Structures are given as structure tokens and as C-alpha cells.
């Protein structure tokens, strides 16, 4: 199952709003607020690489997302 960890930098003051929006994104299995360099970590699992890529694209297109760092999991 294609899986990726996504680290997210959100707009200042919009971290919780971003969390609420992204938790309903298709294929998002887990999401956590962080303190430190990144604001969120998201675990995305999909049935196909195409579905994974589509979910990653939706995350990146969120208006409150400034930057993402994606780490695909090799099984």
C-alpha cells in the first residue's frame, strides 16, 4: 500500500484550521499538530500511487499550507 509521511508548514495562526481542513482529505489516515520547525505531520495511505499523488496534491493546494516535505515509505 503506497504510504507517505508529509511534514507541513502552515500559515502562522492557521495551524489548527489547517489541521481541521486536512484531516478530511481522502487517504489521510493520521494527522498530528506539532511544535517546532513543522506544524503538522500527516500519514497518507492509498491503494495506488496515483491515488497517493492525488491526495498529496490536495494537501499542497490547501490555502493554509506554505510548504510540505514528503517522505515516501519504502516497504
Question: What are these model-predicted stretches?
Answer:
Residues 1-75:
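A compositional/biophysical signature of low hydrophobicity enriched in polar/charged and small residues
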Amino acid at each position: 500500500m503506497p504510504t507517505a509521511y508529509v511534514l507541513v508548514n502552515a500559515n502562522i495562526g492557521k495551524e489548527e484550521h489547517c489541521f481541521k481542513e486536512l484531516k478530511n482529505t481522502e487517504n489521510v489516515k493520521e494527522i498530528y499538530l506539532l511544535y517546532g520547525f513543522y506544524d503538522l505531520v500527516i500519514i497518507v495511505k492509498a491503494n495506488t500511487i496515483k491515488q497517493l499523488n492525488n491526495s498529496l496534491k490536495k494537501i499542497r493546494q490547501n490555502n493554509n499550507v506554505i510548504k510540505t516535505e514528503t517522505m515516501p515509505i519504502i516497504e
